[in-house]
Amino acid sequence: NLAEFVTEYETFDFVGFKDTVKKAVVALNEVLDEGLPLHPLIEQRESVKNWRQIGLGVMGLADMFIKLGIKYGSEESIKWINMIGTEMIFSALESSNELTISKGAYPMFNTKVVDTPFFQALNTKENNLRYQELRSNVLLRGLCNSQLLTCAPTGSIATMLGISTGCEPIFATSYTRKTESLVDKEKLYKVYTPIIQNNFISKGVPENQLPEYVVTSENIPYTERIQVQAALQRYIAVSYTHLRAHETLRH
């Protein structure tokens, strides 16, 4: 949950984020090992063993932007996505590399991975030293996993936790929920999206006076949605639920 790393001073805790990503990679590898013998088909077990694919993802991106006072889809939000994405992929790769000390590299590992456009794109002026160290360690020990990061829609999980789903914007600031009883009685009641309820409504800010940086899928231009996804998928595989305004043209 990216929103959890926003501090009370409206900054992002990159140190805590890095530590969490590394621990999550370790945890997912433990889950993979625990579940490996439970696959019913030998082909499945061999695939898991040979490729060791995990999928650490994110949710709460929209909530994070609201906490930071940044408009989803703005140029500033793209800069933040690049900073967070860079830290996430570096930390995940470093953790997977460190795991090879105890678990070894995944059997299908090939050193040519460091020559791929994806890996080489990490070599920027700001991250050159970190990149060179990572590259050397990968050539020396390999990686424990062939795949590391995957951003799922997280619809059910995020709703259960009361946070924004995956990397999507919030779909509305409020909505109407209906319940039905066994005697066919309906009850309609208004529900505020948790981030709106907690950060504004509960503090006396009316829904019609929310800050301009609070946007929903109904009022974000589809081009900005695409820019957000394009920025994020430089670092992580994305499964994206593209909620759009009703009047958006099919093209």
Kindly give the residue locations of the regions a language model identified:
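Internal maturation/activation junctions in enzymes
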Residues: 20-45, 49, 53, 71-154, ...
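Charge-dense, low-complexity intrinsically disordered segments
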Residues: 11, 15-18, 79, 83, ...
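Residue-level signal for threonine
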Residues: 74, 193, 248
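Function-dense linear segments that define catalytic or interfacial modules
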Residues: 1-48, 58-64, 68, 163, ...
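Catalytic alpha/beta core of large soluble enzyme barrels
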Residues: 28-37, 128, 137-144, 149-244
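Generic, ordered loop/turn and secondary-structure boundary motif
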Residues: 3-6, 42, 55-57, 65, ...
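A short, hydrophobic C-terminal helix/tail in secreted or cell-surface proteins
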Residues: 245-251
